[in-house]
């Protein structure tokens, strides 16, 4: 195994700027910049925040549609209609340099060529907040975060008991149903949500009534419990099952392609993630967080007769991550975050009709991030990270 260390330093000085506040002057708290709660006025990097009320007012069903219209320095790409491949660029960097996290779980796809995450299956009814960090975040999140990071937080339970159901219908047999149950008290909270979206879509073929169907069944769940003032358990889970039809491209033969060629390719997808965290706070100024996380992505492509794709492709990517994070607050103006991480990836695909390719790799990382208020108007951040990859070094 190669042993080569990747080192990143980041030093930022910034003038303080007003917090985004409500009528009661409550400061906005963010988590993504340093992996711990802090006021947005102390963040030394460009950040955009989309909260739950924003998503309710937007009326968009897919997260990608929201981000494409409401975030600067963000480029959203989609290859077609609902369910087709999509990705996001931050600060003009290639999409593989913009990492995505859902409830703290890294969501890149080990089975894809560049490892970037596909946004096409994330529905807005499941989201409470999105934090978009723009610019290099490598000292905290690794070399894949040169362009920035997108942090998606799903809904959590609130005190009391709550239930919600919403149904919307439209043309082309389009239906969207979402429902949830949630609740909580002083020691624990829970949330369970389901959403189903389906549509016949709009086909580019004009000579028949062939459909480009898409279906998305999504389920999220969360549970947290505070056992004592020093020990807390947090957990999140997410599953998305999808089905997509799209127009097949006919391969020309001696007689050419029939003008009435109306076959469709099909893609079945399964995407899941979960994380379980134990938080231990032995001191008022010091806390530890231990996390086990997993993501699983599977895609099956079924070819149409006489199409350019001549076989059925089956891709899967599986990642386990073991994470430790420590936080120490020296005082109100100085704090440090440090951690150890190990990610184990497995992937597989069909090279041809008879050969199956499987591969695995791992990366071990150590990092720290120190934040300090120099004066009332200037903040400084210094961070370093070491990555050891089993293949790349």
How would you label these PLM feature ranges?
Residues 28-58, 87:
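N-terminal periplasmic "start-of-domain" segments of outer-membrane beta-barrel proteins
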Residues 169-198, 207-245, 266-283, 330, ...:
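Transmembrane beta-barrel wall of Gram-negative outer-membrane proteins
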Residues 187-201, 287-304, 335-343, 357-393:
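Surface-exposed extracellular loop regions of Gram-negative outer-membrane beta-barrel proteins
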Residues 29-31, 63-70, 86-89, 101, ...:
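N-terminal periplasmic accessory domains that precede
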Residues 114, 162-166, 204-209, 252, ...:
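Extracellular loop and loop/strand-boundary signature of outer-membrane beta-barrel proteins
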Residues 106-134:
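Short acidic/polar hinge/loop motifs at secondary-structure boundaries
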Residues 86, 148, 161, 175-179, ...:
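Hydrophobic, lipid-facing positions within transmembrane beta-strands of outer-membrane proteins
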């Amino acid at each position: 195994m190669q042993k080569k260390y990747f080192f990143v330093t980041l030093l930022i000085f910034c003038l303080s700027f007003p917090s985004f506040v409500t009528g009661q002057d409550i400061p906005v708290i963010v988590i993504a910049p340093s992996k711990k709660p802090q006021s947005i006025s102390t963040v030394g990097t460009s950040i955009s925040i989309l909260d739950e009320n924003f998503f309710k007012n937007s009326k968009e069903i897919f997260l990608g549609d929201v981000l494409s219209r409401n975030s600067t320095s963000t480029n959203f790409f989609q290859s077609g209609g609902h369910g087709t491949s999509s990705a996001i660029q931050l600060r003009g960097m290639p999409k593989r340099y913009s990492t995505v996290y859902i409830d703290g779980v890294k969501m890149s796809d080990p089975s894809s060529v560049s490892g970037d995450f596909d946004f096409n299956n994330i529905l807005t009814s499941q989201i409470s907040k999105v934090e978009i960090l723009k610019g290099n975040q490598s000292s905290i999140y690794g070399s894949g975060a040169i362009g920035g990071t997108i942090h998606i937080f799903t809904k959590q339970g609130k005190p009391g008991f709550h239930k919600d159901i919403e149904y919307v219908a439209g043309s082309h047999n389009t239906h969207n149903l979402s429902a949830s149950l949630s609740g909580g008290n002083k020691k624990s909270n829970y949330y369970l949500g389901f959403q189903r979206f389906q549509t016949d879509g709009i086909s580019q073929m004009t000579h028949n009534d062939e459909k480009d169907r898409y279906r998305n069944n999504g389920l999220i769940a969360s549970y947290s419990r505070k056992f004592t003032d020093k020990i807390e358990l947090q957990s999140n889970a997410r599953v998305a099952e999808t089905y997509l039809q799209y127009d097949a491209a006919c391969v020309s033969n001696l007689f050419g392609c029939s003008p009435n060629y109306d076959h469709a390719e099909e893609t079945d997808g399964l995407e899941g993630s979960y994380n379980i965290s134990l938080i231990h706070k032995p001191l008022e100024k010091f806390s530890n967080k231990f996390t086990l996380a997993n993501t699983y992505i599977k895609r099956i492509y079924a070819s149409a007769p006489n199409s350019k794709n001549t076989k059925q492709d089956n891709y899967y990517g599986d990642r386990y991550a073991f994470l430790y994070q420590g936080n120490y607050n020296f005082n109100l103006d100085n704090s440090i975050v440090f951690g150890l991480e190990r990610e184990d990836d497995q992937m597989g695909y069909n090279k041809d009709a008879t050969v199956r390719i499987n591969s695995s790799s791992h990366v071990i990382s150590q990092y720290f991030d120190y934040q300090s208020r120099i004066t009332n108007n200037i903040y400084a951040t210094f961070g370093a990270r070491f990555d050891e990859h089993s293949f790349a070094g």
